[in-house]
Amino acid sequence: MREIYRSSIFKKWIKDLRDSRARHRIHIRIKRLEEGNHGDCYPIGEGLSEMRINYGPGYRVYFKDTGKEIIILLCGGDKSTQQQDIVKAKQIARLYDKE
């Protein structure tokens, strides 16, 4: 089982999500990711991936798989904010790369 690290931005996004069913579905997908099942995920560049949750407005979770035992959840959003979220995820990942 892999370790999942959640950025503070991701934690705030998931906490502020009003749709409890969506939040539950996202947590299930993260659990599957932790178990090694990436499911509906696509690379978005710079070593990052987008996990698609086909529910509601099309939720997305952006993450970095370090290749070790750690996956970093960077941020989340939905289809309507996809391009801005990708830019934000890449910025957050660069900060983690510096650490």
Enumerate the predicted regions with their spans.
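Solvent-exposed, charged helical/coil patches
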Residues: 1-31
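Enriched for short, Lys/Arg-rich terminal
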Residues: 3, 12, 23, 38, ...
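Secondary-structure transition/hinge residues
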Residues: 18, 34, 97-99
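A short, surface-exposed loop/turn module that caps and links secondary-structure elements
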Residues: 28-55
